[in-house]
């Protein structure tokens, strides 16, 4: 039976506040539902459009892949054992031959030789030898054995110089440099500015062969030539040397070297291309120039210009090379994040011609793209394709596959397999590999191993913002002991190599560093076993990073830092971190924003232990919390005396508000939830949100709306959650993934009207967004076709 509390006693008929973060206004009466007895509880019915069958098939495919890969490795090990056995047999045979040969030599040495023959031979050899005394008595100007006396050559200082350049340099350039050749002695520290200055004073490029000039320009490294282009152009102009297309290509390669290219650099490169078209008889660019242009546009994240270059190459009947396709593929994966375009380019490389077949780098980029788009199944298929086609596999591919396997519970064990394959192939793990080992242990909730990896990176002075973010992720994912809850062992412990690997890493952790400067504020225990320990250590790590590595702190780290408190701490802990480590950036916010203060229902009170009373300042409330808190770092408590700590806050993002709603739902605090969605409405009017693309805005709004529905559901405010669904039904694509929690809560209390409305929303979404045919349309189709 369903129990509904009276709405009159507690003023529950008040309207829900206006929600600024969504289109339109939502007004609905509030009802609090109490869960009835579990006896006879109806089960959740699956909809016809449910994807459970697809999920089961996907799990079966993953299991089949794991089994087949295990069989492949077993066969590979069997072949390896047979090879080693053959090597052992051949080694045994060769050792036997060596021993037999040695025995034969010993037998020959045992045969006695006539002493007379030995004695005569010694006399003959002694008479033929010339002693050192005889050699010393010979005159110095004695003729040679051939009877021809060699004449001494005249000394040439240029041929006997003690200074030689570390790079190949044309002889004509070397003569003009003179003593400035000393600037070219060290290959790593060449002062090219002084070299060009001395060359200019020695006559520059006047009268030098064009081939020697090109060789000299080719010898300048790409990372330095961009700063020397004005001097080189002046030398070419003074020497009446025309800038050929090959020299200009060197300039373009120098300008496009490095990471991101600005629009100014692209404009300068385009000017050089226009110059090439003018000096070229046919007015066309070469294949090399097009490849350099595509590489430059890729670093500028300009896919439109890349497509224009490809169209021009097609018009000029220039087939793109494998290098060109690889540059475009890398741009789509790492710069533009265009997975669809990346897949099309990769397929073109496979089927266009034999010359453009993808190599290891191309497979690496497309596997990373599939992993980034949560399609580890396709990434594993490509990995198997590389094995079948005998394409070389590198360490980055293994790391990407390990990272992707963490997204599937069925493949958590397989993720560490890929990591251990790096050691099996005798590869030296890179910093990127160590960081993702930390990531794997963090996703597994293995705080002890994550702390050990972070400590190892700290000892090597190799800590990066990414590794710090992964450590915070480990704190938030940690499985601490709770009454009545079991702890799952990390997947690495189910692996024989993994157990040994984990034990060796943990046994080598130094929790007491010799130097305080290089130390990190870890608790002096091997593992953290309580939420208080996790909250305290994460707060200490945050304060330590703010003081010594402030550049590591970014929006991702701040959101993870908030999530630790949302999962492990109390509501006071979360509010303290929310206010002290993040802030609302009001850039772009107009001054005419209205603030509406509505009275809260009396039935919903704050769950915080410390609440602000009338006349009490925020600072006094904060100081009171700091005095009582045992999990907040003393450095963060005394922010006033720590210069700069109080100003090192991170601007909030949409994810920050989602995490805040999760904390409000966990503690069922409606007051804090109302504050969050009110501030989220203000955040939508700031530049940080308005500058985003339309699709990104819609995705973030849907994420927050889903968090609101989940928050209200956990507070048992089912009518409010349903009101949000009804008001945004045609704005967002609601699926059973988001609706299942509310539907389950409504079915538990036999709220049939809510269940019916939720099913209707899911059904209409399948028709509007998924292209599902209506029942009446299907009947009409059958009637017209006759079957």
Curated annotation (Swiss-Prot):
GO terms for cellular component: mitochondrion. It is found in: Mitochondrion. One of its GO terms (biological process) is mRNA processing. Transmembrane segments: none annotated. InterPro entries: Pentatricopeptide_rpt, TPR-like_helical_dom_sf. Residues 1-12 form a transit peptide. Keywords: Mitochondrion, mRNA processing, mRNA splicing, Repeat, Transit peptide. PPR repeats lie at residues 286-320, 321-356, 359-393. Residues 38-58 are annotated as: Disordered. The keyword DNA repair does not apply. Residues 38-48 have a biased composition (Basic residues). NCBIfam families: PPR (TIGR00756). Belongs to the CCM1 family. PANTHER family: OS07G0661900 PROTEIN. Regulates mitochondrial small subunit maturation by controlling 15S rRNA 5'-end processing. Localizes to the 5' precursor of the 15S rRNA in a position that is subsequently occupied by mS47 in the mature yeast mtSSU. Uses structure and sequence-specific RNA recognition, binding to a single-stranded region of the precursor and specifically recognizing bases -6 to -1. The exchange of Ccm1 for mS47 is coupled to the irreversible removal of precursor rRNA that is accompanied by conformational changes of the mitoribosomal proteins uS5m and mS26. Binds to mitochondrial small subunit 15S rRNA. Involved in mitochondrial-nuclear incompatibility, a major determinant in reproductive isolation between species, through hybrid incompatibility of Ccm1 and its interacting partner 15S rRNA between yeast species. This is Mitochondrial 15S rRNA processing factor CCM1.
